[in-house]
Amino acid sequence: MKWSTKQRYRTYDSYSESDLESLRKLALKSPWKSNFHIEPETGLLNDPNGFSYFNEKWHLFYQHFPFGPVHGLKSWVHLVSDDLVHFEKTGLVLYPDTKYDNAGVYSGSALAFENFLFLIYTGNHRGEDWVRTPYQLGAKIDKNNQLVKFTEPLIYPDFSQTTDHFRDPQIFSFQGQIYCLIGAQSSQKNGIIKLYKAIENNLTDWKDLGNLDFSKEKMGYMIECPNLIFINGRSVLVFCPQGLDKSIVKYDNIYPNVYVIADDFTTGSKNQLKNAGQLINLDEGFDCYATQSFNAPDGSAYAISWLGLPETSYPTDKYNVQGVLSMVKKLSIKDNKLYQYPVEKMKELRQMEQDLLLADNNIITSNSYELEVDFRQQTSTLLSLMTNEKGDSALKVEIDKENNTITLIRNYEKRLAHVKIEKMNVFIDQSIFEIFINDGEKVLSDCRVFPNKNQYSIRSQNPIKIKLWELKK
């Protein structure tokens, strides 16, 4: 179905309860409902937003268009968690219900401040001429989960500096001062990151500090979803540079999600990441974008990603549902690399550990499991996951120890990552996989492997010892 602009931007109150019930019934028919990933009840899920800790709970939002598998009039759906594994909806939704966000509640972030959770997000306004004006808007949630929007924008666009591509504010605290990064396209059509600070930490009064200096390379034509976090005294910038030259970072997806590690973050005469290293892919898989990371009150760093990509269709679209979020990953730095690994509480989903010899025979699974292989004393092999009795696989993983590579094969598409492979953990959740090499040195993710009803086994070209756990939430 091709959606017109009018259909995409129908107001929420124009849909009846009967319309919503029909959408829910259709979505339930999808054969690929996940077991331990966050996905929408109906419609499209994309960017994770507002990832934070407040009032003794983890908070998370996701961008949502409830009425179809397309990018339409967006809102935010609110979730809370005690353990970063089990998330529950609170019923709170940040709706596009003011003149400043009448064309959608776009991405943003959150920060616990005093007795409330402060939200900052991009509100898209469109007038009768359909010209877009992006405003950075604010809201706050109290300890009773009551939400109030600020009546006026916090940051207005300056079209002498940027185009209307000016979005995705990330608020963070550094050395007692509150700052905000905003992804943008400069008036010269280059990707930039704008930096602001809250004057005297007044969250309604922001000063433009200029652009963040972190690379001599041209950052494509637009930067989305910038995040700055701090790990063991180092500064880590995570962002999505659209149109990035592939000579800077090799990537095969429509848009990359990358990171850079620096020694320090400074403001004043220069707003910069000092001694910033090279850009590195955050994920070497097929579909990972719009990662949001933040520092918890104890300083630890976490991230969660949208397993999907803009301007992409999926088999679930016919059920009027699309998009999932990754597992929450804890972040660390080792040997000047960013490591990402599922939070420790994920282990509590494991059911009955099995030690198996996997060979060219089918071991039946539920397509909801964790598979672990210690490759230090084992041979190279080709793993077939989500396979049937004939050996037809939805996903293959080729481990080449001699050349230190791992290759993903999905429907004749391939992704290649270079790494000395000692250990591999594979998480499968129906149509989703997340693979972690060496406890997070490399990550390869995807939400577009759609096995048929007969593809639920695993096999290996060469015999290897594995550990296998079914995962139940």
From Swiss-Prot:
Q: Where does substrate bind?
A: 44-47, 63, 106-107, 167-168, 224
Q: Where in the cell is it found?
A: Cytoplasm
Q: For this protein, what is the EC number?
A: 3.2.1.26
**Which biological processes are named by the entry's GO terms?**
sucrose metabolic process
UniProt-annotated catalytic positions: 47
Identify the SMART domains for this entry: Glyco_32
List the pathway annotation: Glycan biosynthesis; sucrose metabolism
**GO function terms (MF aspect):** beta-fructofuranosidase activity
Main location group: cytoplasm
The record's family statement is: Belongs to the glycosyl hydrolase 32 family.
- This chain belongs to the protein called Sucrose-6-phosphate hydrolase
Q: Which organism is it from?
A: Lactococcus lactis subsp. lactis (Streptococcus lactis)
